[in-house]
From Swiss-Prot:
PANTHER family: PHOSPHOPANTETHEINE ADENYLYLTRANSFERASE. The record marks H18 as: Transition state stabilizer. Pfam families: CTP_transf_like. Reversibly transfers an adenylyl group from ATP to 4'-phosphopantetheine, yielding dephospho-CoA (dPCoA) and pyrophosphate. Its cofactor is Mg(2+). Pathway: Cofactor biosynthesis; coenzyme A biosynthesis; CoA from (R)-pantothenate: step 4/5. ATP binds at T10, F11, H18, G89, I90, R91, E99, W124, R125, Y126, L127, S128, S129, T130. It catalyses: (R)-4'-phosphopantetheine + ATP + H(+) = 3'-dephospho-CoA + diphosphate. GO terms for molecular function: ATP binding; pantetheine-phosphate adenylyltransferase activity. It is found in: Cytoplasm. This is Phosphopantetheine adenylyltransferase. It comes from the Bacteria. SUPFAM superfamilies: Nucleotidylyl transferase.
Length: 158
């Protein structure tokens, strides 16, 4: 399909699970905008600029993917970029109720914005940024869970 979709998150840090969803979305849609969110209620490991750069580096092999930092309402960001839909990853039943509420809210706020749910590949179903941060904070090896650009950035923080 030749239209633009948005995959949004804080990506703190970006994981191989995120990359899996982005790669699959890039095969399905004409353009994928990875919207890297500034969330004032969280204390990020990386700044918005760093997270956006890490997503760009991790997705450099995908010609139809771009990373853009943003703050504010996702529905407004989607309108500004003329996106037809949002892409959301759903790991399991715990995510479904929240994600459906979020999808309905974004649709209502935007006037018309569909949400496409993609389950992660089985390999990454259990993975989250929170888990990666916890492993990292306890000096564990996160190499198998994050793209190389993220791994290098984490090592620089040590």
């Amino acid at each position: 399909m030749s239209y633009t979709v948005i995959y949004a998150g804080t990506f703190d840090p970006m994981t191989n699970g995120h990359l899996d969803i982005i790669e699959r979305a890039s095969e399905l849609f004409g353009q994928v905008i990875v919207a890297v969110a500034k969330n004032p209620s969280k204390q990020p490991l990386f700044s918005l600029e760093e997270r956006t750069a890490l997503v760009r580096q991790s997705c450099a092999h995908l010609a139809n993917v771009q990373a853009v930092g943003f703050s504010g309402l996702l529905a407004d960001f989607a309108k500004q970029h003329q996106a037809k839909a949002l892409v959301r990853g759903i790991r399991g039943s715990d995510d479904i109720e929240y994600e459906i509420q979020l999808a309905q809210l974004n649709d209502k706020l935007s006037g018309r914005l569909d949400t496409v749910f993609l389950p992660p590949s089985v390999t990454w179903r259990y993975l989250s940024s929170t888990m990666v941060r916890e492993i990292y904070r306890h000096q564990g090896d996160v190499a198998q869970f994050v793209p190389n650009a993220v791994l290098c950035a984490l090592k620089e923080k040590e």
